Swiss-Prot record:
<keyword id="KW-0237">DNA synthesis</keyword>
<dbReference type="GO" id="GO:0005829">
    <property type="term" value="C:cytosol"/>
</dbReference>
<feature type="binding site">
    <location>
        <begin position="86"/>
        <end position="89"/>
    </location>
    <ligand>
        <name>ATP</name>
    </ligand>
</feature>
<dbReference type="InterPro" id="IPR027417">
    <property type="entry name" value="P-loop_NTPase"/>
</dbReference>
<keyword id="KW-0963">Cytoplasm</keyword>
<dbReference type="GO" id="GO:0046104">
    <property type="term" value="P:thymidine metabolic process"/>
</dbReference>
<dbReference type="GO" id="GO:0004797">
    <property type="term" value="F:thymidine kinase activity"/>
</dbReference>
<dbReference type="Pfam" id="PF00265">
    <property type="entry name" value="TK"/>
</dbReference>
<dbReference type="GO" id="GO:0071897">
    <property type="term" value="P:DNA biosynthetic process"/>
</dbReference>
<dbReference type="InterPro" id="IPR001267">
    <property type="entry name" value="Thymidine_kinase"/>
</dbReference>
<comment type="subunit">
    <text>Homotetramer.</text>
</comment>
<feature type="binding site">
    <location>
        <begin position="9"/>
        <end position="16"/>
    </location>
    <ligand>
        <name>ATP</name>
    </ligand>
</feature>
<comment type="similarity">
    <text>Belongs to the thymidine kinase family.</text>
</comment>
<keyword id="KW-0547">Nucleotide-binding</keyword>
<dbReference type="GO" id="GO:0005524">
    <property type="term" value="F:ATP binding"/>
</dbReference>
<protein>
    <recommendedName>
        <fullName>Thymidine kinase</fullName>
        <ecNumber>2.7.1.21</ecNumber>
    </recommendedName>
</protein>
<feature type="active site" description="Proton acceptor">
    <location>
        <position position="87"/>
    </location>
</feature>
Length: 216
């Protein structure tokens, strides 16, 4: 029986790598699949992992009907046993519903990969719907670490060196006004306190041991 599975974890937890491994494992057993991606880090229609692996994928746009896309491929004589859906947190709610229909009506396995919550600790709409509909929600086998060594559970948006808690849910590269943006995974404590790895290192560097240079 086909199922809808949501693999979710914070940034740097290897979700895209796992998606590529899943695709490889499925195809190695003579199963035919379709790969989907949205807002990939490469900027193109690909699934790209942080360790350098990359494959072509179908670009998911807001207007793409995933169920009809699969039906169209099948009607042309294609064989589809599974779907790999990367960056699924960005998918529209109705597209998650369409994926559930692919599982139920077409008996095709759907494996989704994505972040659960944004930098504001609010659920992405696509992820929220996946939690509501998925047959299984799976955490990645490898957990990233906060700079303090604790398991990292929160995604932080850093703008000009400072952690921010407001702004558009989706932000890539520059966010305008000459500001530089990047992301960092933190434990809940340091996300709540707004202490990033850079701030921690700066604080430590300012701490000096008492030393009297006049003594020999």
């Amino acid at each position: 029986m086909a199922e809808l599975v949501f693999h979710t974890g914070p940034m740097d937890s290897g979700k895209s790598t796992l998606a590529l491994q899943m695709d490889h494992a499925q195809s190695a057993h003579d199963r035919q699949g379709v790969r989907y991606a949205m807002h990939d880090r490469s900027g193109g229609a690909r699934i790209t992992s942080r360790i350098g692996l990359s494959v072509e994928a179908v670009e998911v746009t807001d207007s793409l009907d995933l169920y009809q896309d699969i039906v169209s491929r099948l009607s042309r004589g294609g064989r589809i046993d599974y779907l790999i859906c990367d960056e699924a947190q960005f998918y529209r709610t109705k597209q998650i519903d369409q994926l559930a229909r692919v599982v139920d009506d077409l008996d095709i396995d759907v494996y989704c990969f994505g972040i659960l919550a944004d930098f504001r600790t609010e659920l992405f709409p696509g992820s929220k719907r996946l939690v509501e509909l998925a047959d299984r929600v799976v955490e990645p086998p490898v957990s990233p670490l906060c700079w303090c060594g604790r398991p990292a559970t929160h995604n932080a948006r850093i703008v000009d060196g400072k952690l921010v808690r407001e702004g558009d849910q989706v932000g890539v590269g520059d966010i305008g006004g000459g500001s530089e943006i990047h992301y960092e995974v933190l434990c809940r404590r340091h996300h709540r306190q707004g202490i990033t790895g850079e701030i921690s290192r700066a604080t430590l560097s300012e701490q000096t041991l008492p030393f009297d240079g006049s003594r020999s």
